[in-house]
Amino acid sequence: MALPLRPLTRGLASAAKGGHGGAGARTWRLLTFVLALPSVALCTFNSYLHSGHRPRPEFRPYQHLRIRTKPYPWGDGNHTLFHNTHVNPLPTGYEHP
């Protein structure tokens, strides 16, 4: 006895069901405008308030940091590729801008 073959249809696909996504889209739109956008604005404002200039920490010449066994192949050989004079010290200390 042979089993009846069903036609290949998309019976479980969401496109086959009607009126499926209306409530979910409304919920996510509400969450975006009520929760996400004010949170981004609040974080931006907080970042703006705390964006003042902070003094550099005191330089401490630790023996295990900033070891140069051979020079870098660019520049003077002492600065790293993405060296920032305001943040990154050299082995001898901070640079004076």
Curated annotation (Swiss-Prot):
Q: What is the membrane topology noted in the UniProt record heading this document?
A: Single-pass membrane protein
Spans within the Mitochondrial matrix topological domain: 13-24
A Pfam family in this protein?
Answer: COX6A
- Cite the annotated pathway: Energy metabolism; oxidative phosphorylation
An annotated GO cellular component: mitochondrial inner membrane
**Transmembrane feature ranges:** 25-49
Intervals, Mitochondrial intermembrane compartment: 50-97
Q: Name one GO molecular function term.
A: oxidoreductase activity
**GO biological process: one example:** mitochondrial electron transport, cytochrome c to oxygen
Q: Tell me the residues of the organelle transit peptide.
A: 1-12
Source species, domain of life: Eukaryota
Q: Spell out the subcellular localization from the entry.
A: Mitochondrion inner membrane
Q: Does the keyword Ribonucleoprotein apply?
A: no
* Record key words, sorted: Membrane, Mitochondrion, Mitochondrion inner membrane, Oxidoreductase, Transit peptide, Transmembrane, Transmembrane helix
Major subcellular site: mitochondrion
Q: Outline what the protein does.
A: Component of the cytochrome c oxidase, the last enzyme in the mitochondrial electron transport chain which drives oxidative phosphorylation. The respiratory chain contains 3 multisubunit complexes succinate dehydrogenase (complex II, CII), ubiquinol-cytochrome c oxidoreductase (cytochrome b-c1 complex, complex III, CIII) and cytochrome c oxidase (complex IV, CIV), that cooperate to transfer electrons derived from NADH and succinate to molecular oxygen, creating an electrochemical gradient over the inner membrane that drives transmembrane transport and the ATP synthase.
Which protein family is named in the record? Belongs to the cytochrome c oxidase subunit 6A family.
According to the record's subunit comment, the protein's assembly and interactions are: Component of the cytochrome c oxidase (complex IV, CIV), a multisubunit enzyme composed of 14 subunits. The complex is composed of a catalytic core of 3 subunits MT-CO1, MT-CO2 and MT-CO3, encoded in the mitochondrial DNA, and 11 supernumerary subunits COX4I, COX5A, COX5B, COX6A, COX6B, COX6C, COX7A, COX7B, COX7C, COX8 and NDUFA4, which are encoded in the nuclear genome.
Report the protein name in the record: Cytochrome c oxidase subunit 6A2, mitochondrial
Encoding gene per record: COX6A2
